[in-house]
């Protein structure tokens, strides 16, 4: 997900997005552990999406304070 798409969301939507990404990341790690995952780069992309969303969430919270 692009940063511009995340910046358009409000704080509650960002928190839900982070929660969804964390669940997806967990599922991907479990697939990797059971050797069902063929494209391992998806884990890296998901991890970076989580970091991107958390960064924007922090920016929004500090901007509102």
From Swiss-Prot:
Name a GO CC annotation attached to this entry: cytosolic large ribosomal subunit
Q: Superkingdom, according to UniProt?
A: Bacteria
Family membership = Belongs to the universal ribosomal protein uL29 family.
Gene Ontology biological process terms in this record: translation
- The gene name on file is rpmC
Q: Which organism is it from?
A: Leptothrix cholodnii (strain ATCC 51168 / LMG 8142 / SP-6) (Leptothrix discophora (strain SP-6))
Spell out the protein name for this chain: Large ribosomal subunit protein uL29
InterPro entries (alphabetical)? Ribosomal_protein_uL29, Ribosomal_uL29, Ribosomal_uL29_CS, Ribosomal_uL29_sf
Q: Which Gene3D superfamilies match?
A: 1.10.287.310
Keywords on this record?
Ribonucleoprotein, Ribosomal protein
A single Gene Ontology MF term assigned here is:
structural constituent of ribosome
Entries under NCBIfam families matching the protein: L29 (TIGR00012)
